[in-house]
Amino acid sequence: MAKISKRMKEISAKIDAEKKYPVSEAFDILRDVSSVKFVESVDVSVALGVDPRKSDQVVRGASVLPNGTGKTVRVAVFAKGPAADAAKEAGADVVGMEDLADEVKKGNMDFDVVIASPDSMRVVGQLGQILGPKGLMPNPKVGTVTMDVAKAVRDAKAGQVRYRVDKAGIIHTTIGKVNFTSDALKQNLEQLLTDLKKAKPSVSKGIYLKKVSVSSTMGPGISVDFSDLNI
């Protein structure tokens, strides 16, 4: 059995695993137990009342967090003509078509998000085996295949997070950094949960938002009471 580090023992002593903490208190605890030399992300896990084995219960989508994620996001856009010009004006870091595809094939992928106009998918479609495993393949369900590439670029730059339910029925994503104020993190969490509720499959029965936990990059999960959130 692996030994529990002294740091983790000290952290665990401050957290009641059986308790659901008020959201702001949970964020305070994350800051209190953060002892690493970098600014940790604040991550959230949301257990949903869905059966992801069934295709009509796979929850996926995107949420634009009002206070961003605290990360600098590099965006690549596959587009041409006016759409390419609009993407550049919106702040895209890389814009192209076949030339951008060639760079991807060479392994030159210095970007975090890929957006594509519908007419560029003939080019992007050939890159599925490269972009797919990295989670970069554009998809209309999360707004990364779109006629309005400029808006997609602005959303990505503003702090859009994408999510997809895993095999256990859980959504994992980030809602900011530990140096965000509790109010900023709370607003981001509220936006995410609001968007998740909108994405509820019509066939999902019973309790949909079952459990919400927050954690820092190197910290333990803390179950939160989300009943008083504005969602």
UniProtKB/Swiss-Prot annotation:
CDD domains: Ribosomal_L1. Binds directly to 23S rRNA. The L1 stalk is quite mobile in the ribosome, and is involved in E site tRNA release. Protein L1 is also a translational repressor protein, it controls the translation of the L11 operon by binding to its mRNA. GO terms for cellular component: cytosolic large ribosomal subunit. Gene3D superfamilies: 3.30.190.20, 3.40.50.790. Keywords: Repressor, Ribonucleoprotein, Ribosomal protein, RNA-binding, rRNA-binding, Translation regulation, tRNA-binding. This is Large ribosomal subunit protein uL1. InterPro entries: Ribosom_uL1_bac-type, Ribosomal_uL1, Ribosomal_uL1-like, Ribosomal_uL1/biogenesis, Ribosomal_uL1_3-a/b-sand, Ribosomal_uL1_CS. SUPFAM superfamilies: Ribosomal protein L1. One of its GO terms (molecular function) is structural constituent of ribosome. The lineage of its organism: Bacteria, Pseudomonadati, Pseudomonadota, Gammaproteobacteria, Thiotrichales. It comes from Francisella philomiragia subsp. philomiragia (strain ATCC 25017 / CCUG 19701 / FSC 153 / O#319-036). GO terms for biological process: regulation of translation; translation. Belongs to the universal ribosomal protein uL1 family. Part of the 50S ribosomal subunit. The gene is rplA. It comes from the Bacteria.
